[in-house]
Amino acid sequence: MADEEGETEVQEMEVDRRESDESADDEAKEKPDRVDGGVKNGEVPLGEADAPVDIETINLDPEAEDVDLNHFKIGKIQGFEVLKKVKTLCLRQNLIKLIENLEQLVTLTELDLYDNQIRKIGNLETLRDLQILDLSFNLLRRIEGLESLSHLQRLYLVNNKISRIENFGTLTQLRLLELGSNRLRVIENLDSLRELDSLFLGKNKITKLQNLETLTNLTVLSVQSNRLTKIEGLQNLVNLRELYLSDNGIQVIEGLENNNKLTTLDLASNRIKRIENIKHLSELQEFWMNDNLVENWSDLEELSGAPGLQTVYLERNPLQKDAQYRRKIMLALPSVRQIDATFVRF
């Protein structure tokens, strides 16, 4: 009887290409629009009027806690002093050039200025309760003006023109920092961020993993689409669970000896020839290794120490030329339920 008759029938169902929580390809955080905009009337969304909106024509509710003026043609921050209880202020996708006139909004905990024309961070000194600040997609060149925000927990500075990591000394409660799509070359000045949980540095010009020693609480690190050639400097990150290093120039898998808690390892689109030095990663669930130079089937033995491995990406490696590509992966890694973009059902 042929071997095929005794093997379990495999059904395949196409699924979407993998998506990282980090969304490091664009590192741009998406948020749903808030239902309660805190606006009574006078709303004029962007595109419905030829001239910029005069904020004085918008009747703000003084009792509103959540105010959403997303996608208006607001050119200047003004008239918000009537908001006595506001906690969340969303001014996304406007024409704002200057952070100003927010001094009286001392109850504010979240300020969203994503996608404006702001060139400098400033005038935030009185917003001491601020926990979330989004200045992504602006024209910032420096990180500054944050000294008074000691309660800040999440800071988004994606897609600006920032060339240096600096001035984080007082942000000791920061848990999430997004600096993707900037002009950074060096990882530095993060020593004080001991509570940091997630760090996103994708799409910069970083050449070395360094100066991460004090970030022992870090669970997510993304340095995708940079200029790395070596995995190093991660020995103190013992709580790291997700590591994204795709689209670099890495040649060898190494330097992960102390990262035993990794559940996701993304090394796609590098120059790696061997799967090695990861047999100790027993908690690994997702391993992305597509678009590399792996050609030896025996390398899959390195993944045998992860009984919970669910997803592997190995497409566009020399291995894929084998006619039995998928079957060999399933035999070597019986726990896997997704190979590349296809689910496997036994």
From Swiss-Prot:
Residues 317-346 form the LRRCT domain. Residues 1-13 have a biased composition (Acidic residues). Keywords: Leucine-rich repeat, Nucleus, Repeat. Its main location: nucleus. Residues 14-37 have a biased composition (Basic and acidic residues). It holds the Pfam family LRR_9. It comes from the Eukaryota. LRR repeats lie at residues 63-84, 85-106, 107-128, 129-150, 151-172, 173-194, 195-216, 217-238, 239-260, 261-282, 283-304. It is found in: Nucleus. The keyword Nucleus applies. One of its GO terms (cellular component) is nucleus. Signal peptide: none annotated. Residues 1-46 are annotated as: Disordered. Belongs to the SDS22 family. Regulatory subunit of protein phosphatase 1. This is Protein phosphatase 1 regulatory subunit 7. It comes from Xenopus tropicalis.
